[in-house]
């Protein structure tokens, strides 16, 4: 029996169980994708338009090509049978998946550990404030330790509103986003791709899932908006193939 048939272990490994410790109404959680990957030259060669997989952090566990809005030719379904055997594979593609990785170091040379890409992304908005930046890491040993383990809380702490359930987060008071993070020449795209690359390079199960998507077009579902094409993730898939 391998890890892909042992669903409870696999589920806990990626932290996709529904019993989260925080008391946030997940249905009212903010939009999951804040930075849309910008396509580069030849990115259209990373995928085929006749196979489209759509996902987000609460995706239904449907066979490849049978999720809402997905596309797959009938004759190609057999190419994704192995992927379909993995429970909740779509959720693993989300930034919210708990796929711990190491990336970056502090001034003493200690590696930063991150619970998810979501944590890494939001932390890097606040490199101007070391204490708040480090509160997003698993190295954190302060009052934000719960947040450092929970992607939904990380989104709330690092989001534009800086609120949890309508209440201002005290730790955000007076802390502003780095001026070089957003904008035409901002770091946001680079940071997101760095996080994705570390996630898939350091997590063998996440890597396996990504590779099993083969040449499918990967689109992240965003609440009340159009899908976001995950060009960066597909670039990494190409690197790993």
Predicted segments — roles?
Residues 10, 15-26, 30-241:
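Charged, low-complexity intrinsically disordered segments
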């Amino acid at each position: 029996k391998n890890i892909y048939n042992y669903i409870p272990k696999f589920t806990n490994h990626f932290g996709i169980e529904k019993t989260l410790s925080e008391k946030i109404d997940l249905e009212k959680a903010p939009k999951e994708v804040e930075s849309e990957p910008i396509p580069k030259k030849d990115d259209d060669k990373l995928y085929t338009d006749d196979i489209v997989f759509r996902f987000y952090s609460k995706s239904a566990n449907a066979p490849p090509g049978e999720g809402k809005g997905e596309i797959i030719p009938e004759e190609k379904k057999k190419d994704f049978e192995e992927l379909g055997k993995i429970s909740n594979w779509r959720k693993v593609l989300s930034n919210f998946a708990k796929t711990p990785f190491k990336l970056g170091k502090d001034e003493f040379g200690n590696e930063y550990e991150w619970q998810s890409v979501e944590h890494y992304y939001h932390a890097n908005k606040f490199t101007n404030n070391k204490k708040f930046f480090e509160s997003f890491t698993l190295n954190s040993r302060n009052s934000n330790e719960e947040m450092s383990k929970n992607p939904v809380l990380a989104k709330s702490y690092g989001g534009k509103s800086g609120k949890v359930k309508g209440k201002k987060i005290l730790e955000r008071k007076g802390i502003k986003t780095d001026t070089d993070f957003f904008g035409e020449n901002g770091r946001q795209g680079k940071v997101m791709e760095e996080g994705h690359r570390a996630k898939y390079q350091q997590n063998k199960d996440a890597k396996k899932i990504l590779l099993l998507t083969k040449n499918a077009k990967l689109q992240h579902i965003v609440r009340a908006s159009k899908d976001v094409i995950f060009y960066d993730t597909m670039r990494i898939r190409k690197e790993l193939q």
